[in-house]
Amino acid sequence: MPFTDKTNKRKTFNIISNMKKYFLVITLAITSVCISLAQSVIGKWKLDDGTAIVEVYQEGDNFNGRIVWLEEPNDPDGTPAKDNNNPDEKLRTRQLIGLNMLSGLKHKGGNEYGNGSIYDPGNGKTYNCSMKVEGNTLRVRGSLDKRGILGRTMDWFRVK
């Protein structure tokens, strides 16, 4: 009998040990998924000045962003705000809501995106763009050069 008692204890210990391992693996997997979702660039982001919300979405390998909300959605004449500063006169009738202002960004690894462009409807200019997700903040860098040396960084904030 003492032999079977030790065997049963060993089996019980092994079962509990295996359960702990499975629990640890499942916990790590769930944590990893939660962290990756929290670090995802996809979603809605409010600009640092609070004047607009941009929805970032994935299309194939590219990440793009369109304006989905404006603090001032209408022009002074009461019509929907338009792309009045666009250098191409034909595009000045485009409505700002729905306008893509981020385009062609590629996932560079981790929480970084780059090699894209950002359009500023305020001045009608397009700049090189890179982004980095830091929790609920999206650090967006627009620059004159592809390396991002000559430019500025804006912090956008995730909208729940």
Predicted features, each with a name:
Residues 46-47, 148:
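Structural recognition of beta-strand segments within beta-rich domains
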Residues 3, 58-61, 132-136, 157-160:
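A short, sequence-level motif marking secondary-structure junctions
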Residues 118-135, 140-143:
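Acidic, glycine-rich flexible loop segments
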Residues 1-40:
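Bacterial Sec-dependent N-terminal signal peptides
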Residues 36-41, 70, 146-150:
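Short beta-strand segments and strand-loop junctions that repeat across beta-rich extracellular domains
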Residues 51-52, 143-145:
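Short beta-turn/strand-loop junction motif enriched in small, turn-promoting residues
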Residues 137, 145-160:
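Edge beta-strand at a domain terminus
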Residues 42, 48-50, 54-120, 126-127, ...:
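Central antiparallel beta-sheet cores of small beta-barrel/beta-sandwich binding domains
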